[in-house]
Amino acid sequence: MTLIKSISGIRGTIGGRTGDTLNPLDIVKFTTAYATFIRRHTTNGSGKIVVGRDARMSGQMVDSIVSGTLVGMGFDVLNIGLATTPTTELAVTMSQADGGIIITASHNPRQWNALKLLNSRGEFLTKDDGNEVLDIAEREDFEYAEVDQLGRIINDSSFDDRHIESVLNLNLVDVEAIRKSKFKVCVDSINSVGGVILPRLLDRLGVEYKFLNADPSGDFAHNPEPLEKNLSGIMDEMKSGAYDLGIVVDPDVDRLAFICEDGRMFGEEYTLVSVADYVLSHTPGNTVSNLSSTRALRDVTSKHGGTYTAAAVGEVNVTTKMKEVGAVIGGEGNGGVIYPESHYGRDALVGIALFLSSLAHKGCKVSELRATFPEYFIAKNRIDLTPSTDVDAILEKVKELYANEQVNDIDGVKIDFPDKWVHLRKSNTEPIIRVYSEASTMEAADALGKQIMQVVYDMQ
């Protein structure tokens, strides 16, 4: 049983003892802390907070507690029900709310849930703001509303359609070209909110579709993380040759993976690369992704005359850096597309619409499009440590050892070699160092990772 507290909110498994899991008492405590934070930092606000949730089995229970607590704190709750993470983010700005709470554990298994906290811009809290919420929760410095100041719950199911409309109105989403292409797609929406909103998006785009795991029951048919090892069902379906494209989302629809017409993975790292290539071909500019993302985005950005910048891992770090450098597109290599023309948040609907627009313009197969991008492979490893290990000291030694290479230490240590890179990050929740490495072949990437791992082992 697990309860993890971080600057972006809290997540944990359902059931168990207070303080050990995500249970009703802790949900009340952290919702109250967030509401206290919003109250302290909002003047002349709407007094309204948006609440949306994915379809996981505990969602309705958590939603009831969150909404009731916010009402008890004197806030009106704009409850949008079953909704994607990007839909909830957009609902905050569309309704001019003071903030929002997304009830989702993203790609985690069904026994998990979480509260993800948004500011009035519909973006995740900064590190400082998140730490303030955690501090308020720790001190339990709460004051609830008197009976005459209690809030109310307003149910509003209009935001799916408003989200879709905003996507269709993006300048680079070519609805006519997509309709003329008469695409046929297969979609795995993993028994969550993708099965609610994506059919409506595809209908508006004139795309013929078949859905797998469409029922939003929250009883996930397979591990919900959109990785190749979890996607045998849709990959086998694609091998029938009946579809132009396979589309996979995670339970809250902020991550997006594609499958080629022949059943091969397009590659989660290449979701952002392909969409960025299309965007940059029409609106040249800068890009941002996190340090653990593929070098292919840098190559594509350079091809279009822009500058690529790496950010620390985490959506809020990526969006902050995007604003600093004026990036026209960015995201994370796990299939997260952030397109500021829409909003500063990962959005699979935006990614789907832009990818289909690109495919329609190029008039090629998905596998042919994939072949136009630089070929890189990422290996992922981990170094298990003892709880007493000084991880920061180890990372500092690694940095010193490779001082003659290009080193970035904004988030762990990343070493850039001319034709490959390796990134070491310490986990916030386990005594481990995560090791990501990339090269032109999987063998070379794995060998680089193992080489650095041996360097670390020799230091202990």
Region spans (language model):
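An N-terminal, well-structured beta->alpha segment
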Residues: 1-68, 72-73, 152-185
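Gly/Ser/Thr-enriched, mixed-charge loops and adjacent short helices
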Residues: 13, 113-239
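N-terminal small/polar loop signature for handling phosphorylated ligands or for N-terminal nucleophile
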Residues: 36, 48-112, 200-259
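Short glycine-centered, acidic/aromatic-flanked micro-motifs in structured strand/loop junctions
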Residues: 52-54, 187-189, 260, 341, ...
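Proline/glycine-rich low-complexity loops and linkers
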Residues: 71, 131-165, 169, 260-333, ...
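Short beta-strand-to-turn element immediately C-terminal to the catalytic PLP-Schiff-base lysine
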Residues: 117-120, 257-261, 338-340
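Phosphate-binding and adjacent anionic-ligand microenvironments
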Residues: 245, 283-460
